[in-house]
Amino acid sequence: PLSEYEGPGRANAGRQVFVFGDTFIGRVDPATGARRDFDMVYNTLAYLDGGQPDAERIQFVWGKNGSRQLRSPQVGKDAVFLPSTRQAQGAGTCWYWLQDGLALADHMYLMPMLVRRDPAGPPGFQFADFGVCLLKIPIAGNGLDLARHAQIDAPFFHCDDARKLYFGAAFMPNTSAAGA
């Protein structure tokens, strides 16, 4: 919620933000369920006014800075957030998979995984995660000021021969404003 309140009972009074990783944007054949004329975008957002599912009260956001424009025939290039951190530089084609986030004071913070192409992966899974970043997005008016977001490499990913460790998923604010 943009209001910061994470406890029960107030969702109907505010605006919620949903974050998505891979998203298909396009049309679906109603008879077959097959996707037609679509683009796959690596990260998108949605705003929902109130706390109940309602197609009239949800707005999906994609494209650079939330422009809602599909501007590239390349898969994934129409994401809201395109990696620009030091860790992303030189990594080849990479993207963010949005994970968890929270609103705190006048910013929303997201902890996306940094992912790149990996041709050695099995069919359909030619990607590998290689980092975690922090996105800091100003809250302005009734939404996010996506054009003014900041990206920071976060030291919350560790990989060795035995395992991968990620931090930054399923975190919640422990503040009175959040209902704690």
Region roles according to the model:
Residues 1-180:
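Carbohydrate-active catalytic/glycan-binding domains of CAZyme proteins
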